[in-house]
């Protein structure tokens, strides 16, 4: 906890720009009631009943109204931050909001009121045990949600669904640790611990439970982050037409002239609530045109960062020598789907062909021009992403959550190995359980550095 975490803070809590309502929020920190009551009197000219909406004038330093609106006073600990909080809801014009903000700062100068940093109100809520860290992150995720599914999942995380799963895992790990460490503390008790306490059975159940949580978290991360899909291939194979077909709109220029697309064209579409970030790129070929060469270099950069590459071919020509050269340069760790476009010119029915042998690629035959096979391609992208259609109860998760869950999974696997070696490895068994617990606690913030908190809350908007 930093020294500044107890400062009184103020910020405009609503989005920039004009609106029907604007909100200025004050959290009084260490100032408490001694700071709150004089500020309320200076701004509102009267006392406020706790947790009641009062329609009052917002007064300047001379007692003249700056605005009129709703004032709400929340004494600690019954507030968003867990501190004494004042919210002033006025008209949402930027000038009015700035005047009201400055009035708060001037009136609160005597007790050290300052502007809040990004995410500082939610940071206070975390530090005062109103939210755990996973719930605090869900606040930002709910604000930033780009799909209905992502918003609903963020709401479940904010409600504590993810945190409850983590706490249940931690409780089970702690229970098992207690059994192991009790045996280590009393070696004179000649009890076969592993058999009597069914330690291996308990560990197996914890590992299965963790695998389930990790699976749900992967689904949640997919809802939050989406999938980056790069369209790559030679010129004139229909990449821009495919982008337009996937998006359902004319986003990219389509002509028979090779090299029309010289820089990337990106569009995010939603498929079953999953954001697919589709990137149309310059056609891959040898060229003397400097502008086109720059576009091709950017294409390869996008391919290296992609989650999936769609390698487009002209179905009339199949896999040519130039296509083989392109395919040989694809990064080894990036999934590639071979898309044979223009089936309207060959008479081949739209279909998906999954690999018959290891090392082969999935092939999708389609016509971007007519739209044949586009739904099949969307379904294939979701399959590659690992999305389970109709998954209920998914909560939004972040990459740091996945990293912590995978690390905990690895520590539990090591613990299982030590359990198989029986009593001679009980101390190592206990240590791996401790490390797994540490990783799980980091998700909810029970074991977290100030540096990590700074990174997480700096990404919030000011006033939240």
Swiss-Prot record:
Signal sequence segment: none
GO cellular component: cytosol
Binding site for (6S)-5-formyl-5,6,7,8-tetrahydrofolate: 25, 87, 130, 464
InterPro entries noted in UniProt: G_TrmE (IPR031168), GTP-bd (IPR006073), GTP-bd_TrmE_N (IPR018948), GTPase_MnmE (IPR004520), MnmE_dom2 (IPR027368), MnmE_helical (IPR025867), P-loop_NTPase (IPR027417), Small_GTP-bd (IPR005225)
Subcellular location: Cytoplasm
Main localization, broad class: cytoplasm
Pfam family, any one: TrmE_N
Binding site for GTP: 236-241, 255-261, 280-283
Record keywords, A-Z: Cytoplasm, GTP-binding, Hydrolase, Magnesium, Metal-binding, Nucleotide-binding, Potassium, tRNA processing
Details of cofactor binding: Binds 1 potassium ion per subunit.
GO BP annotations, alphabetical order: tRNA methylation; tRNA wobble uridine modification
Cofactor(s) this protein cannot do without: K(+)
Positions in coiled-coil regions: none
Residues the entry annotates as binding K(+): 236, 255, 257, 260
EC number(s) recorded for this UniProt protein: 3.6.-.-
GO molecular function list: GTP binding; GTPase activity; metal ion binding
Enzyme class of the recorded protein, top EC level: hydrolase
Domain TrmE-type G: 226-386
Positions of Mg(2+) binding: 240, 261
Stated role: Exhibits a very high intrinsic GTPase hydrolysis rate. Involved in the addition of a carboxymethylaminomethyl (cmnm) group at the wobble position (U34) of certain tRNAs, forming tRNA-cmnm(5)s(2)U34.
Quaternary context: Homodimer. Heterotetramer of two MnmE and two MnmG subunits.
Family membership noted in the UniProt record: Belongs to the TRAFAC class TrmE-Era-EngA-EngB-Septin-like GTPase superfamily. TrmE GTPase family.
Protein name: tRNA modification GTPase MnmE
């Amino acid at each position: 906890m930093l020294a500044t975490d107890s400062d009184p803070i103020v910020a405009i809590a609503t989005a920039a720009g004009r609106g029907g309502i604007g909100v200025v929020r004050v959290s009084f920190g260490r100032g408490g009631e001694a700071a709150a009551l004089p500020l309320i009197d200076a701004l509102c000219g009267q006392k406020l009943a706790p947790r009641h909406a009062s329609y009052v004038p917002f007064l300047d330093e001379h007692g003249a109204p700056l605005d009129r609106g709703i004032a709400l006073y929340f004494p600690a600990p019954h507030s968003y931050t867990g501190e004494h909080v004042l919210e002033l809801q006025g008209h949402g014009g930027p000038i009015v909001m700035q005047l009201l903000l400055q009035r708060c700062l001037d009136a609160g100068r005597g007790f050290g009121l300052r502007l809040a940093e990004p995410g500082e109100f939610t940071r206070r809520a975390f530090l005062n045990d109103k939210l755990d860290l996973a719930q605090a992150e869900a606040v930002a995720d709910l604000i930033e949600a780009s799909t209905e599914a992502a918003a609903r999942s963020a709401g479940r995380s904010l409600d504590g669904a993810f945190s409850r799963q983590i706490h249940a895992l931690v409780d089970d790990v702690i229970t098992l640790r207690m059994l192991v460490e009790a045996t280590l503390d009393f070696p004179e008790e000649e009890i076969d611990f592993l058999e009597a306490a069914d330690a291996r059975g308990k560990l197996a159940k914890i590992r299965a439970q963790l695998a389930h949580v990790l699976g749900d978290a992967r689904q949640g991360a997919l809802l939050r982050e989406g999938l980056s899909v790069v369209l790559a291939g030679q010129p004139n194979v229909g990449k821009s037409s495919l982008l337009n077909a996937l998006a359902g709109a004319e986003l990219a220029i389509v002509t028979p002239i090779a090299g029309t697309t010289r820089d990337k064209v990106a569009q995010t579409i939603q498929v079953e609530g999953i954001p697919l970030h589709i990137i149309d790129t310059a056609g891959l070929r040898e060229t003397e045109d400097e502008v086109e060469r720059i576009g091709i270099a950017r294409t390869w950069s996008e391919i290296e960062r992609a989650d999936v590459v769609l390698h487009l071919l002209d179905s009339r020509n199949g896999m040519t020598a130039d296509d083989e050269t392109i395919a040989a340069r694809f990064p080894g760790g990036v999934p590639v789907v071979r898309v044979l476009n223009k089936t309207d010119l060959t008479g081949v029915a739209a279909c998906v062909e999954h690999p018959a042998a290891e090392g082969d690629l999935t092939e999708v035959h389609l016509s971007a021009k007519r739209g044949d096979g586009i739904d099949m391609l969307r379904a294939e992208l979701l399959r590659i992403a690992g999305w389970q259609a109709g998954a209920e109860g998914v909560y939004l998760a972040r990459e740091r959550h996945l990293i912590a869950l995978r690390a905990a999974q690895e520590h539990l696997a090591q613990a299982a190995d030590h359990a198989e070696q029986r009593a001679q490895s009980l101390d190592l068994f206990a240590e791996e359980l401790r490390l797994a617990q540490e990783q799980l606690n980091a998700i909810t913030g029970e074991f977290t550095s100030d540096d990590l908190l700074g990174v997480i809350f700096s990404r919030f908007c000011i006033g939240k």
